[in-house]
């Protein structure tokens, strides 16, 4: 596979095909997240919370962080594009764009993030000077955080290309509408997920 395909597979995979593979991606991400305690509190955030919640919560969360942005970007595509925009293209490519977060869910199996978080909490919030953590856990947690950052950048790049190609937009208009859609989507998915968490927790 060419490196460019990792950031823009949508020239070859779009429409119903992208939607199908996108659903598979969300299914795998939700299932893996359930076992690794990986949450996605908004469309781009990743959190590892060792808390038992039903599998249905993880699947609904995947739907929320895909459906809301897809709706928002579809509206923005209709506003900005002079050509016809197919619903299935926007929704399909936005679903497929989430495939980097399968890796994020797998990273949740590392307990180092939890131990690092507990250590910082004890040290700075509880002022527990006896708190300890291994060098291995610190290094692993830092590596995981760095990988999370790369995965987030990868996701955003994929979503931009999905929006740009599906809406037939270019240049400043594509960038401006995407940034606006991204900001609104983050806020909207965060608020809905807070409400959902309250229902399941």
Predicted regions mapped to residue ranges:
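Juxtamembrane boundary at the C-terminal end of a transmembrane helix
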Residues: 187-201
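Membrane-helix interface motif
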Residues: 34-44, 109-122, 195-198
